[in-house]
């Protein structure tokens, strides 16, 4: 709701005011990797860094593991961290130092994780010392103080536990911190998000033998988590609801433990949740979470439930609207009006026409593709998407939407892409609408077979994701072009991309490679698409390898020529209508994130800015500080003024801050935020800062796997991306004597980022781990084989684990 406060002046008076002089002041930080490598006191340099240094730390080259990120260097950082914790008294400047040191450690572990299998791990002793640093911090009486800097320190030092993978050492202190959650502390969702790092770490320790052993000896923690969720059920009606949801969800994930008592207690909690929050009740997302965990790890607990009927009932309630486009799309939605759905149809029709022209398809589908219709399922918000989509459609939800092709050769198949709206006004505001629709079109007209068929020989992810990005952005993809100065990738490297690589390489560099090929070598693209349309993916991979080597030098030169070209509006998407006419002389200026802009102004003057918040932003706040009396007003996706705004914390003086809490998925809503700095009186030397931290650009943790088990079928190959661990299972019917499993790497062994290594473990009675299993194949690389004798019907369970660098692998099962 808008908070509107009228001042005794007219809008026209503001427009006619003479603009006062502004001056820019940017922080100069010696935090680049090269500067840190030359620093005589690394801990001091890290301690004094600003927020915008983090990107350089997380994106540092693997060579830094020999200097600033070496074991010896981190040992000295750990000593400095303990010293700072010992003297911590809750002061903001002290907290900033702690956060900097914590982020530096996390960056080191992230760089190590991405360095490949040839680089030694940090020692267990070092990781344990960092875990003890977290304990030391949480035992400090000021550890849970509130305030921007204080919360930043708490979040960094608790999330560090997942990086060093030492939750068994910190579980007690993190559980004790959780008990400080109450109605007062719940008001600060950033603080609550710091407590939530316990559950991030629990998810990150799935299939971790040390964690499962710890929980087997400390099952009282399951009782504590159940009481926590029950006692704090009131929080389900607040913005802090995610902490209760995640407490129960991660309790459910303990069903994967091989320890029977752990599993028994976790199952009892899930059954209690289902009874307390039945489907159709106000907080039935907890029922859904319990069902999801049980269906993955304890399906026997769901006997007697008609889940298919439950899905139909839920879909009818959550997505009641249906609109058929004249083309292939059928739009199901939670809150789109018919007029909005019709506009979406226009957008998709325009995109389809553009697609056929760019890809030169002749409107001819590939053979055996029966997906002549596609269902577009649009949730009203990210919260709804996270709550319901996985249960209804089986997709993961830690993303901006997903295309689910199914098996295109089956007549009863339903092609579907699932999306959500990032705003609920008159505009469509459907995230990644064109990107996901391009996936449907590309699969139907350019790619023979299923998604697994497409990935079977590698060298195609650059096209699948890069082409979808190109069709959405064309020449206007600023985020991709902005990557170039930070370090070029060769075309061959981009062509070798798999889904186990980072999002920049998959999407943005994929876009650059596709754009280069379409603009400079369209005939080669035609030749490649002729191969993919006929299912010749091995030949595709061979040809792409040749083209990469052939055009590497040209691609490098071409990158230097790029600049952003703004595309005209697509047909059917009207420009946003302003709430009031905008005066011609009013200018809205882009505000650079994480940089201080110093402003001065007269009474009643107004300065307008905007800042773009990208996807995967974990922290965003806008603040002013200075002399005089200036006020801060903001709006989302529309120009903000003092007389028309959505958010403000205006007060006497020029010291104000607006914080934006993350949504249920842990990220701040992406989009454009507008800022009005208005003089209630004159003001001078006021610093305006939009501080944000983006996980996609500076990944704070290793990429998370989809931990939902993949159900295998005999004779059908499945391709899985494994970062750290994945689960799979196959149901073996009566009469089968032996199950044989082949796992093969889909990556290029010559990839400069290093070949992966995924090990395969199997058990018949429980989910296996690296220590507790019945069968194992753990050779070097990701090519593994198991022959498993069976004597009765039931599931065989598999765990795929990457001790260092992950990989894309294909699993194939046969019964004998």
UniProtKB/Swiss-Prot annotation:
Residue numbers binding Zn(2+): 435, 439
EC class: hydrolase
Active site: 436
Keywords attached to this entry: Collagen degradation, Hydrolase, Metal-binding, Metalloprotease, Protease, Secreted, Signal, Zinc, Zymogen
Compartment(s): Secreted
Catalysed reaction, written as an equation: Digestion of native collagen in the triple helical region at Xaa-|-Gly bonds. With synthetic peptides, a preference is shown for Gly at P3 and P1', Pro and Ala at P2 and P2', and hydroxyproline, Ala or Arg at P3'
One GO MF term attached to the UniProt entry: zinc ion binding
UniProt cofactor(s): Zn(2+)
Keyword Ribonucleoprotein among record annotations: no
Cofactor binding description: Binds 1 zinc ion.
Residues making up the signal peptide according to the UniProt record: 1-27
InterPro entries referenced in this protein's UniProt entry, alphabetically: Peptidase_C_arc/bac, Peptidase_M9_N_dom, Peptidase_M9A/M9B
Enzyme Commission numbers on file: 3.4.24.3
Gene3D superfamilies listed in its UniProt record: 1.10.390.20, 2.60.120.380, Collagenase ColT, N-terminal domain
BP terms from Gene Ontology: collagen catabolic process; proteolysis
GO cellular component term of the entry, any: extracellular region
Role summary: Possesses gelatinolytic activity. Can cause weak haemolysis on blood agar.
Family annotation (PANTHER family): COLLAGENASE, MICROBIAL COLLAGENASE
Family designation: Belongs to the peptidase M9A family.
Protein name: Microbial collagenase
């Amino acid at each position: 709701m808008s908070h509107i406060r009228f001042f005794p002046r007219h809008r026209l008076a503001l427009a006619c005011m003479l603009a006062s002089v502004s001056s820019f002041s940017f922080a100069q930080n010696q935090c680049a990797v090269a500067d840190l490598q030359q620093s005589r006191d690394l801990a001091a340099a890290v301690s004094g860094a600003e927020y915008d240094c983090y990107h350089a730390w997380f994106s540092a080259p693997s060579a830094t593991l020999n200097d600033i990120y070496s074991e010896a260097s981190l040992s000295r950082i750990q000593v400095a961290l303990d010293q700072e914790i010992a003297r911590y008294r809750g002061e903001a400047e002290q907290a900033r130092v702690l956060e900097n040191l914590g982020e530096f450690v996390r960056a080191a572990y992230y760089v190590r994780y991405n360095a490949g299998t040839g680089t030694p791990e940090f020692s267990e002793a070092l990781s344990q010392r960092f875990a003890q640093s977290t304990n030391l911090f949480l035992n400090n009486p000021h550890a849970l103080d509130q305030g921007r800097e204080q919360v930043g320190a708490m979040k960094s030092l608790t999330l560090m536990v997942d990086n060093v993978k030492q939750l068994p050492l910190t579980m007690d202190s993190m559980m004790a911190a959780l008990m400080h959650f109450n109605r007062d502390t719940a008001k600060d969702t950033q603080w609550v998000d710091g407590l939530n790092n316990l559950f991030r770490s629990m998810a990150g320790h799935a299939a971790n033998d040390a964690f499962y052993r710890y929980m087997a000896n400390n099952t009282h923690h399951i009782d504590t988590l159940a009481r926590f969720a029950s006692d704090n059920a009131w929080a389900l009606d607040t913005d802090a609801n995610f902490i209760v949801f995640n407490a129960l969800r991660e309790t459910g994930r303990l069903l994967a433990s091989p320890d029977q008592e752990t599993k028994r207690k976790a199952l009892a909690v899930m059954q209690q949740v289902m009874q307390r929050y039945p489907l159709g009740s106000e907080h039935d997302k907890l029922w859904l979470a319990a069902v999801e965990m049980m269906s993955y790890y304890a399906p026997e607990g769901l006997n007697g439930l008609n889940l298919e009927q439950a899905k139909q009932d839920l879909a009818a309630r959550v997505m009641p609207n249906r609109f058929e486009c004249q083309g292939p799309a059928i739009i199901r939605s939670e809150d789109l009006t018919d007029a909005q759905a019709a506009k979406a149809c226009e957008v998709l029709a325009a995109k389809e026409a553009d697609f056929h022209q760019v890809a030169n398809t002749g409107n001819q589908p590939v053979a055996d593709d029966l997906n002549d219709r596609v269902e577009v399922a649009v949730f009203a918000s990210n919260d709804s998407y996270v709550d319901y989509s996985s249960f209804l459609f089986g997709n993961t939800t830690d993303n901006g939407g997903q295309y689910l092709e199914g098996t295109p050769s089956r007549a009863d198949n339903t092609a579907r892409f699932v999306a959500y709206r990032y705003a609920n006004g008159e505009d469509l505001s459907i995230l990644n609408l064109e990107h996901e629709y391009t996936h449907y079109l590309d699969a139907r007209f350019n790619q023979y077979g299923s998604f697994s068929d497409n990935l079977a020989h590698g060298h195609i992810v650059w096209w699948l994701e890069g082409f979808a990005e190109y069709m959405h952005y064309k020449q206007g993809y600023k985020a991709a072009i902005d990557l170039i100065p930070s370090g070029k990738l060769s075309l061959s490297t981009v062509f070798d991309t798999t889904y186990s690589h980072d999002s920049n390489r998959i999407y943005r560099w994929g876009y650059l490679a596709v754009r280069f090929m379409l603009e400079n070598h369209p005939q080669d693209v035609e030749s490649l698409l002729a191969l993919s349309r006929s299912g010749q993916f091995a030949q595709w991979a061979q040809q792409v390898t040749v083209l990469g080597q052939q055009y590497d030098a040209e691609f490098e030169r071409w990158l230097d020529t790029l600049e952003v070209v703004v595309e005209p509006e697509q047909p059917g998407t009207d420009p946003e209508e302003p709430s009031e006419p905008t005066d011609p002389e009013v200018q809205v200026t882009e505000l650079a994130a994480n940089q201080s802009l110093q402003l001065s102004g007269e009474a009643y003057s107004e300065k307008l800015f905007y800042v773009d918040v990208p996807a995967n932003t974990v922290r965003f706040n806008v603040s002013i500080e200075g002399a005089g009396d200036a006020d801060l007003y903001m709006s989302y996706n529309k120009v903000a003024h003092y007389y028309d705004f959505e958010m403000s914390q205006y007060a006497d003086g020029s010291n104000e801050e607006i914080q934006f809490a993350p949504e249920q998925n842990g990220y701040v809503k992406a989009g454009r935020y507008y800022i009005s700095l208005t003089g209630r009186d004159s003001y001078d030397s006021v610093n305006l800062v939009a501080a944000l931290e983006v996980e996609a650009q500076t990944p704070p943790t290793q990429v998370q796997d989809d931990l939902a088990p993949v159900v295998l079928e005999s004779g059908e190959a499945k391709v899985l991306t494994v970062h750290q661990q994945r689960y799979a299972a196959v149901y073996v019917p009566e009469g089968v004597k032996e199950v044989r499993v082949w796992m093969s790497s889909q990556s290029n062994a010559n990839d400069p980022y290093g070949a992966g290594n995924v090990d395969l473990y199997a058990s018949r009675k429980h989910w296996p781990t690296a220590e507790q299993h019945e069968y194992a194949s753990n050779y070097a690389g990701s090519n593994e084989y198991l022959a498993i004798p069976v004597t009765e019907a039931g599931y065989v369970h598999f765990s795929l684990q990457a001790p260092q660098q992950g990989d894309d692998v294909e699993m194939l099962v046969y019964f004998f």
